[in-house]
């Protein structure tokens, strides 16, 4: 799947070096909760794409994963020159809803939330769980119901 964003202003989250390093050391559950909250705050999630802007899908045996992060700094770690031709890419909540959700459902892809170089499989959740968590927190924090729909 190719990510083609509309011309929109991406609300980026600025990450200090201290925050970056501290969060990378947290367990996958803490990183997951942090990521979900930041996706709601910024209405953006970050992933990696190849040189043709196709989503990079990780595999482990017969399982497929879409890696997602809360900010480009974390996604950028997976885009090492010479190691691969990946680049980080923002996905707005609108694009995620309109295009990516269907792609994930059609291809049986799980969500790999906030993997790190040390822990390439972060918290693995299915799409339904991911959407339910985001909707629950969005309603709790902002009174928004159905931030995403399946």
Residue ranges and their predicted role:
Residues 2-150:
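Conserved NAD+-utilizing ADP-ribose enzyme module
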């Amino acid at each position: 799947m190719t990510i083609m964003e509309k011309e929109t202003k991406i609300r980026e989250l600025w990450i200090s070096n201290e925050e970056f390093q501290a969060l990378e050391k947290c367990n996958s559950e803490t990183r997951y909760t942090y990521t979900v909250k930041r996706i709601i705050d910024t209405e953006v999630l970050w992933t990696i794409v190849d040189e043709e802007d196709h989503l990079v899908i990780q595999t482990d045996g017969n399982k497929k994963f879409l890696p997602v992060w809360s900010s480009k700094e974390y996604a950028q770690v997976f885009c090492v020159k010479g190691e691969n031709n990946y680049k980080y890419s923002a996905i707005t909540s609108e694009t995620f809803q309109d295009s990516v959700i269907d792609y994930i459902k059609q291809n049986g892809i799980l969500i790999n939330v906030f993997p790190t170089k040390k822990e390439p499989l972060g918290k693995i959740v299915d799409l339904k769980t991911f959407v339910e968590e985001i909707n629950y927190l969005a309603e709790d924090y902002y009174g928004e119901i159905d931030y995403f729909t399946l």
